[in-house]
């Protein structure tokens, strides 16, 4: 037992998934007590946090506390805890059994979500499972009033947000009772409720809650109470998360509290929330608990390092076993209102913590000539090879081989008796086996290649892992307008300090900070946090003097509420501070920013507008002119300042730091005899030159060569990182297998950052919110190097565009030129997709291209929205631009581009065709595309500065060869499979498969697929395809090319780079004059959105990969002279050999998002009667096809509606005995209740009160179930 103490202890606890960390502040002791326990160890204790407190109390009170007895609390001042109970329950889907209650007509709303697929190349379309087991619909409906609605009958009601509404269907409680009883009979007593427009009219949700509780439900989560913000889908998902997790949390907390005397009634107990604030047990709920542990780490590094150890903004880097959390701090916590965790959207204030699937457990693989790290993890069981459980090689194994992990300082908890150290021998053996494979491959590429050693291979994998973790750090900083290199890296977590120097150097950072408690910083951070009370309500108004007076009134009410809640917890006025926020957006955009109030010059009021404009310009790079600011929400935050832990200074250093011993550690260039120091034996002012190891408890801090570690006044480690001074020299005549992976990451990262720049700086809904764009970089010959995975129909297609421009302009390209094109004959898809191309020169020589393609909402043509269903010639579809320099020698050619867009050429026999109806939006989005290209250029130039132009261009070629190899291997495998299943298909070395399908007009897509089994080459011969059609579903050749490259990438099913190499072993033959290679005059608007889907179905059917999907994008446009709206509607995906097709999702060649139902009704004159799955529309089979969707829209004013769709005649086919999916259908229901079939392509003038009903196709089934 230790010395008996006077006073009371303070406990900070982080109950993680694997370990529970306990930090206790002991009265009279200069240092805290640190304890690390297994979170689950049932043979020794029931609960790790309780056990940690028990052990520490025993040690410092001198009293034995039996595990079976309650723990005395007379020596406990407070307990603060973060817990992964909620996170684990969400990840493992082990929450409470719950049901969902929704407005009638929206039973499937949360399952559909925004329609988007999580991974566009995953043919199984794996989506997270629903949290709810059952759904019940309540008969009620609230409708927002239109601006010109009168109130003759006095039926208008003013909602919480200030919007006027009508209750068109009162709450039907009697009808709901039997449905609730049915849930109780099934053992479900927890309910999540989301009703349409409850953010502004919560009464019906409250009626549901009252009735449910009266009938015996244990817990009800109301979306309107949890997050009163417009958008039903994220609000509803948040309610399901809360209903799913809160009972689990309450049960755990109740069990924890019951282990103490008096149920901790006299001890202040607080729990960490996702927003970095503490809350008492009574206010700790599921939707605010998911980031409980990571939030403690952010509080920990921000409150102990920023301002004390550095003035630079900090990047938090928390590397664990399976993932790494990245965050940022610059004097205030960066928060988001909405994020996605474990595949589920949560809408609540939370710290902006980005997670990447790379950690100590990330698997190491050598595939297709490149090193790959993750995203799969070996997990805690069996873990890495060194854990002695038969695991696979992981990052931890690489660190062990290099000497970054020291077995002497790692707990001996492995082996059958859990008493063995890490297994170095087994790890080396596994690496030696892998080295054999790698060196055989390298010799096959270059007979003179020298064998790589185990250490070189391990270092290579660590380098690739570091680059994987650098990508989210660059994204976190640069997408918000910050320079990454101007930050310091705050490193914590078990594995982070081993990688910190290398990551900082790669990012251009000069400073790394490692907290003295880095291994338990999340626990330590609990003691630095304040109690937070948040309150928010919707308010919809134009920002201005009149609305601000209402804002201040609402703020006053909300501030009173949070103050009262804090006062109830014992906070006096002197310990309470408050913050106010407005959620603001520009009119016509969906991009809202939560703006913290700042005092005006005279201190009399908060000037939210000025702060919004500043933040908007910083994040998006521009300001919008002549646009109103709209208020969305009013929010206040009450802060109860607590008695936090205080940083303690350490003693000044003796003359020479004590070296414990030396170890061999492998760095770039070879082995180094490296001294090891213990942090506990180092003092303020000690300086340690790298290479060195500093042991900090269970954390290993690696100080690399050319770095210097300094012990600070507070006992933390500051590492000065010497930046790379010269470019890296690599051989250009052969690809280095490590650098190949790193360049893959760098090239893809550049394309992704271009995409984020375009999304940030664009203003149109199509680009900014629906994400209908794509960005890429190209080698000097126009070959695709990297294409970020945005919209599949754009993938690979831009290479044809770049090469056409290269041929067209020839020597007439100059530095400072930017090209624009959208014409199908110039490699375009359809006219709304405008491509901006920037050639880049070095010393007068063309060295690469960057390009961005975005869907512009308007480019002219015979109908608003430029998507006419009945166009017969290209000139009817809008402005068609083959080649134009939108920037010439650095000067933006506004007059020229305006002329092209506003005065498109038309056929001489026709009347004039209208030009674009939104020229300012076109100009703004073109400038956004130019900015995205410029971002790509600057990033590639940084790469060239680091490696040299020759090396970068060489690796532009090598990444293409790498992708080519992957596709060749896949084609060989497919050929062998097909020939074994159907021997007659093989002649010699070749396998031949023929497939065809029919468009709704009877046109044939015919494919003869021939695969050379030896060479891994394929011919896609579309000879036999029908001629050009007198309609608009002709598809330019680039569309078919995009469909083929998409299919190949899906079939490879490995995260290879998407580039020109994917098409290198492929020949695509398209007969000229067919509707897949139409004439220059052909109408093509439907080819991109309809025919592309049908080509994809034919290709995947030929490969026997999966049954046909819905085969359509179900394009809907409507509007009048004052507005326009465009959407694509999902459907059913085809089933495959081992999976059912996914229902109600965007399939294959698109992945654009659906507008939330509440936003849809708020901004447009519509009433959405139904949006749900079209049950049983998927084809039956051994594996069932996915169901399509039903969408019923009532128009509340006269509009012109256009529908452009396919699969209304021919059904999506099943495969291998699977049945066909149901074909789609489009109907107009008139005011006199007639149901009129519209066919697949039509334009109709709709009157107020008429309803459009769209039934999208289901997917085909796979395999016979007979």
Curated annotation (Swiss-Prot):
Its main location: cytoplasm. Catalyzes the cleavage of 5-oxo-L-proline to form L-glutamate coupled to the hydrolysis of ATP to ADP and inorganic phosphate. Acts in the glutathione degradation pathway. Keywords: ATP-binding, Cytoplasm, Hydrolase, Nucleotide-binding. This is 5-oxoprolinase 1. Disruption phenotype: No morphological phenotype, but high accumulation of 5-oxoproline and decreased concentration of glutamate. One of its GO terms (molecular function) is ATP binding. GO terms for biological process: glutathione catabolic process. It catalyses: 5-oxo-L-proline + ATP + 2 H2O = L-glutamate + ADP + phosphate + H(+). It is an enzyme of class 3 (hydrolase). Its EC number is 3.5.2.9. Disulfide bonds: none annotated. Belongs to the oxoprolinase family. One of its GO terms (cellular component) is cytoplasm. It comes from Arabidopsis thaliana. It is found in: Cytoplasm. Expressed in roots, stems, leaves, flowers and siliques.
